[in-house]
Amino acid sequence: ALSWYLKDPRDVYYVKSPKSFLGASGLHEIQISFFEDLVCAMMANIKQQAEKSTQATITDAMIGKPINFNGLGGEAANKQAERILINAAKRAGFKQVLFEFEPVAAGLEYESTLTKDQTVLVVDIGGGTTDCSLIQMGPSYRGKTDRASTL
């Protein structure tokens, strides 16, 4: 894809990390639709492969999300990105779509080893985002569905 793009950038869409664009400011509806189509195709493929592997219908999706999708757009960028992900997941066949902050998801395994509450620095380096978060973790936080207040 990169070599095609370099030959003629006017004729090819080249997106290295789609998630990093989901919260971009100034996107037109056609661009938002393009990203939704792209994410939907990826989710549908993953869903199909998982259903084939498990021989079961999968109706729920838990999606990791960075604390902020795009530093410049603030909460509007986060809402735009979440809307794209929800629409794509529903179109891919998921009935229930839930989100978890990526640094929380990254720290959950470690939290299961803690015997007392403490503040933990979780560094989550992904394909398009990096989150460094101080998170309250430990026995009294386990099982809480909303961890936003612990960040």
Q: Residue locations for each model-derived region?
A:
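Generic structural signal for well-ordered alpha-helical scaffold segments
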Residues: 43-51, 108-111
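Adenine-nucleotide phosphate-binding core of ATP-dependent small-molecule kinases
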Residues: 28-48
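A near-ubiquitous, low-amplitude feature marking generic local secondary-structure context
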Residues: 1, 5, 26-29, 33
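Oxyanion-binding/catalytic loops of NTP- or PPi-dependent enzymes
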Residues: 1-12, 18, 56, 63, ...
